[in-house]
Amino acid sequence: MAEHRTKPSELDQGKCDADDNVKIICLGDSAVGKSKLMERFLMDGFQPQQLSTYALTLYKHTATVDGKTILVDFWDTAGQERFQSMHASYYHKAHACIMVFDVQRKVTYKNLSAWYTELREFRPEIPCLVVANKIDADINVTQKSFNFAKKFSLPLYFVSAADGTNVVKLFNDAIRLAVSYKQNSQDFMDEILQELENFNLEQEEEDVPDQEQSGSIETPSEEVASPHS
């Protein structure tokens, strides 16, 4: 089980190897409550960082999974979702996705299909958790059947950022699934992107006179990932 232990500022990040870091992205229409959910989960133990260059907000969090310290980067869209599409860099090396809709606005549920299609274009295998937010407005929605999650065999969470219902469970499960994905399977999309990156660097080096060349290209270790449950 994943649980909050300490603030990132209190952790000696240098002691953590690369496997102790995961990236979790949030998707969904504007105003469905993505940021509010993160703030509810992290409460006072977060320091959101606005990255205007990439039009996103980054939330850092520290969790413990099976006795191991995990540094978690939660990526929020910061308004970019109003264009109904995200830049490819938003998806790059993400280990799990939290996809949110507002139970009071049917259009946000209908748009899940478009978000999911784009997600799978860049991250074909990562775990995706579907979130029905704002159930505090009408608890009866928890009795409804949302076929989108069933169609793609995705876990569905009924939550409320307002009163905290199921928020901790949602994020703890997302962290656990992200860690499992990273540790247990290979994501070929990352391999392809890395190969293209290396190829471009090699091409650039070929264009530079021998006497001006310096440094070397390091091949990163393979990132593993597993079929999500």
Curated annotation (Swiss-Prot):
What UniProt keywords apply to this chain's record, in alphabetical order? Answer: GTP-binding, Nucleotide-binding
Q: By its UniProt entry, which InterPro entries does this protein fall under? A: P-loop_NTPase (IPR027417), RabL2 (IPR041835), Small_GTP-bd (IPR005225), Small_GTPase (IPR001806)
* Recorded superkingdom: Eukaryota
Q: Which cysteines are joined by disulfide bonds?
A: none
> Which residues belong to the signal peptide in this entry?
none
Query: Where are the residues of the annotated region Disordered?
Result: 200-229
Q: Where does GTP bind?
A: 28-35, 76-80, 133-136
Q: Which family does it belong to?
A: Belongs to the small GTPase superfamily. Rab family.
Q: How the protein assembles, per its UniProt entry?
A: Interacts with IFT27, IFT81, IFT172, ATP6V1E1, HK1, LDHC, MAPRE1 and HSPA2.
Protein name as annotated:
Rab-like protein 2A
**Species whose genome carries this gene:** Pongo abelii
List the gene name: RABL2A
